[in-house]
From Swiss-Prot:
This is UPF0309 protein SCO4393. Residues 36-220 form the SIS domain. GO terms for molecular function: carbohydrate derivative binding; D-sedoheptulose 7-phosphate isomerase activity. InterPro entries: RpiR-like_SIS, SIS_dom, SIS_dom_sf, SIS_GmhA/DiaA_subfam, UPF0309. GO terms for cellular component: cytosol. Gene3D superfamilies: Glucose-6-phosphate isomerase like protein, domain 1. Belongs to the UPF0309 family. It comes from the Bacteria. GO terms for biological process: D-glycero-D-manno-heptose 7-phosphate biosynthetic process.
Amino acid sequence: MSDHKPAGQFLDAAIDLLRRVRDEEADSIEAAGTLLADTVQNGGRLFAFGAGHSSLAAQDVVYRAGGLALMNLLTVPGVVGIDVMPATLGSALERVDGLASAVLDSSPLRAGDALVIISLSGRNALPVEMAMHARALGLRVIGVTSVAYASQTTSRHASGTFLKDHCDIVLDSKIAVGDAELTLDTVPAPFAPASTVVTAALMQAVTATAAATLADRGIEPPLLRSGNVDGGHEWNARVLEQYGERIFYRR
């Protein structure tokens, strides 16, 4: 139901975007979930990365009640989250050539693993280089990005390419360039970003698909339960012990 107040307008816009990704990205979501299920079944590890606010959707699938225990956060110091001071340093680091390759070469990632790279614009050096180098190392790469940026902005990577150009599977968040859903005559800039809502939903849709795919194959999905329900800690201890060699957030 439409609402003329900003809060209602934003929620309507977010709901419309969620419907679009549900309908238009269904095949890509299915493919991404299947890729994660294949990786789990074949003994691989799962990783997710996002810079700045894009890291929120990556963090939301790591050590998460109802999520896959095998999903690990790939961290880049000063880039994941906005806890670095000044916060603008994180944005600057995204544009540094060579950083992504150094991170991957120092990480536990190896051929046969799957890496989800989340970048709204997909234009900066870090996500582009990360996808390129990850594939060169033999990883499967899923990109979560807004494809609109590739046609309406220029790449900041030396190759002139975007994240979407170096992924096995691309999930398009449909977010408009600028990431702001609302405008008002009385407000001098667009406002109310929806990228976190949509990107987090895409990530959960992919992990849900992966869990169901594993179950369809007769494999118990390595899921975590909430630690705030009876028996949750015992359940999680069993799963973390069983898959400990593929889980890095406990080390």
